[in-house]
């Protein structure tokens, strides 16, 4: 064997095994959810949960970083979203929390840090509330830009609305649901800074359209009228709340969530840090650093 061939063969034998995997989890009501795992099999576990209408693919900048840094990374598409099955039932937060529980159990995820964006945080809060017997599976929570109450009570004072950064009025929720097809592009664009490229915006918009407008409307109505304020004080694991100065969700009310969680911490991405609702996409280097610093502290 020639020396070059011998060296090539030796290097090939030393190449780390590809541990990336894509599979399906079947929920208790028979829906198949698409998931991916990457990174070392024995690495610290981290699970990324997308927001309303979003997909696992939108976490790709986090998957690339954390899997390369030695973490075992799991992402999944919620029912009706992304590459998962798209039934005509189950579009409510309680069902999505049950789906999350099925995923955790079937993949046997333990000592896992959950990073949840937007509605993914609501799903995590619902899961914490509904499945107390499974709480020891989770080591850390990172809640990204989600209000504890999305829709303001019409009888609230302005101060009460600001305290929780309620984004909608009741009529506003139903208007969004009714006009879903036309409302989606401007609504998605409002979640980014002006610096997002048109190619990136169109790609994210295409991800949003992987769930039907009908099912997205049903889901947002259920999501928008949930109130998680009584759940927050019962979270007893390390939790970080991330807000954005440029987000559609006013940062003070998002950071307020951390004050309701015992020992909760908060970090607000500034304008200079591209602190939009999608700061993890627009400033992945800073976002990944903040998350990793928290879960390893």
Predicted ranges, named:
Residues 125, 133-175:
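Flexible "cap/lid" loop of the alpha/beta hydrolase fold
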Residues 236-275, 281:
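Conserved loop-alpha-helix segment in the C-terminal half of the alpha/beta-hydrolase fold
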Residues 28-31, 68, 75-119, 132-135, ...:
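Active-site loop/oxyanion-hole signature of alpha/beta-hydrolase fold enzymes
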Residues 152-162, 173-233:
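Conserved alpha/beta-hydrolase catalytic His-Asp/Glu region
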Residues 120, 124-128:
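Short helix immediately C-terminal to the catalytic nucleophile in hydrolase catalytic domains
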Residues 1-46, 68-71, 109-110, 136, ...:
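Alpha/beta-hydrolase fold catalytic core
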Residues 53, 78-82, 121, 148, ...:
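Alpha/beta-hydrolase active-site loop signature
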Residues 31, 36-86:
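Conserved HGGG/HGGXW glycine-rich cap/lid loop of the alpha/beta-hydrolase fold
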């Amino acid at each position: 064997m020639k020396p070059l061939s011998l060296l090539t063969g030796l290097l090939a034998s030393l190449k780390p095994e590809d541990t990336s995997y894509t599979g399906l989890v079947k929920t208790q009501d028979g829906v198949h959810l698409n998931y991916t795992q990457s990174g070392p099999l024995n690495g610290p576990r981290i699970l990324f949960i997308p927001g309303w209408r979003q997909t696992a693919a939108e976490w790709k900048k986090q998957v690339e970083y954390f899997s390369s840094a030695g973490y075992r990374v799991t992402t999944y598409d919620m029912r009706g979203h992304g590459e998962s099955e798209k039934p005509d039932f189950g579009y409510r937060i309680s069902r999505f929390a049950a789906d999350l529980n099925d995923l955790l159990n079937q993949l046997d995820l333990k000592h896992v840090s959950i990073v949840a964006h937007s509605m993914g945080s609501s799903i995590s809060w619902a899961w914490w509330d509904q499945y107390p017997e499974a709480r020891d599976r989770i080591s850390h929570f990172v809640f990204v830009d989600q209000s504890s109450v999305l829709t303001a009570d019409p009888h609230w004072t302005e101060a009460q609305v600001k305290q929780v950064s309620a984004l909608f009025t009741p009529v506003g929720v139903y208007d969004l649901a009714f006009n879903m097809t036309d409302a989606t592009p401007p609504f998605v664009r409002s979640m980014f800074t002006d610096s997002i490229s048109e190619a990136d915006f169109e790609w994210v918009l295409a991800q949003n359209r992987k769930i039907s407008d009908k099912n997205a409307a049903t889901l947002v109505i259920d999501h928008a009228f949930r109130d998680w304020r009584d759940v927050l004080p019962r979270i007893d694991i390390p939790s970080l709340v991330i807000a954005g100065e440029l987000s559609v969700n006013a940062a003070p009310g998002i950071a307020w969530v951390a004050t309701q969680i015992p020992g909760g911490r908060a970090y607000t991405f500034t304008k200079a840090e591209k602190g939009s609702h999608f700061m993890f996409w627009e400033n992945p280097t800073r976002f990944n650093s903040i998350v990793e610093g928290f879960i390893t502290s």
